[in-house]
Design a protein with these regions (language model features):
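Short, small-residue-biased leader/transition segments that mark boundaries at the very start
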Residues: 2-4
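Membrane-targeting and insertion segments and their boundary/processing signals
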Residues: 7-10, 66-70, 143, 147, ...
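Active-site acidic/histidine proton-transfer and metal-coordination neighborhood
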Residues: 9-109, 119
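Histidine-acidic metal/acid-base catalytic patches
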Residues: 93-107, 118-261
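Active-site glycine-centered loops adjacent to acidic/histidine catalytic or metal-binding residues
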Residues: 113
Length: 261
């Protein structure tokens, strides 16, 4: 466990470097939210991201999540923190939008992940269009779409080598907002070899079963391969930064061309 003084020192260091801190937790229950908020307040973070992991029929799962969000609103809406719920493989875009709207919580918005809608049997641009009015944060990654029986899985890969419409997604997201950018944070997630199966299917009824799942993780290799894998993780992360910069430069050049012609 990290003590309060260590968390405070971490926050102080981030501020000296002119960095913001976002806390992320892979659940939405009371205990997980309380722990994440406590860390956020001790570090001086600005935002807490969460996503639900419940098993049950869709309507029951949505009801549980709505209760979780109500707890966040009633307990922490005056904390000074903002909150994001991430679309994370099991819920469809319109279901997430409904949760945010019905919460009537001004400090709650959506975190858009480049690939997580695939497992809910949606495609990136369609999901983005549905979620767009409520997106304030983004996880950038690339992935290969894996066709499964009646649904879709995704296997994360090196950015630029997958099926995600990388440039189109970035362009849409950058353009959100009128007088100022709507998206305030982009997280780069290079999760090479992470795999997530299909959770929603073409032939499902209007109240499908949502299976329980563990929090997302990429399996580690055997011990003798671990050092090489960790070196590759660092290389992959640097490559992703360079890829995103190159795509942003392309977008900038095209925008300048349109403005000047």
């Amino acid at each position: 466990d990290v003590c309060s003084s260590d968390l405070s020192a971490f926050g102080d260091k981030a501020r000296r470097l002119n960095l913001d801190i976002h806390i992320e937790t892979s659940a939405s229950d009371k205990a997980s939210i309380d722990e994440a908020v406590a860390i956020a307040l001790k570090t001086g973070a600005s935002s807490v991201r969460f996503y639900p992991r419940y098993e049950g029929n869709l309507r029951d799962v949505l009801s549980i999540i709505a209760n979780d969000i109500a707890y966040v609103r009633e307990t922490y809406q005056d904390s000074g923190l903002t909150f994001t719920i991430e679309q994370h493989e099991d819920l469809k875009s319109h279901e997430l939008v409904s949760l945010v709207k019905e919460s009537e919580m001004e400090s709650l918005s959506l975190l858009f992940d480049f690939a997580n809608m695939i497992n809910a049997n949606e495609h990136p641009i369609d999901a983005l269009k549905t979620m767009a009015p409520h997106i304030t944060q983004v996880h950038i990654k690339d992935a290969l779409i894996v066709k499964e029986e009646g649904g879709l899985g995704h296997k994360a890969c090196i950015s630029g080598q997958g099926d995600m419409p990388f440039k189109a997604l970035l362009t849409h997201l950058i353009c959100l907002g009128d007088d100022e950018p709507q998206v305030t944070a982009y997280g780069l997630e290079e999760e090479v070899d992470y795999y997530a199966p299909a959770f929603r299917f073409e032939d499902e009824d209007d109240n499908p079963w949502i299976p329980y799942r563990q929090m997302s993780e990429t399996p580690l290799p055997e011990n003798h391969l671990l050092d090489a894998r960790l070196r590759k993780e660092k290389e992959d992360a640097i490559n992703q930064i360079n890829h995103v910069r190159n795509v942003l430069q392309q977008i900038k050049q095209e925008a300048n061309h349109l403005l000047n012609h």
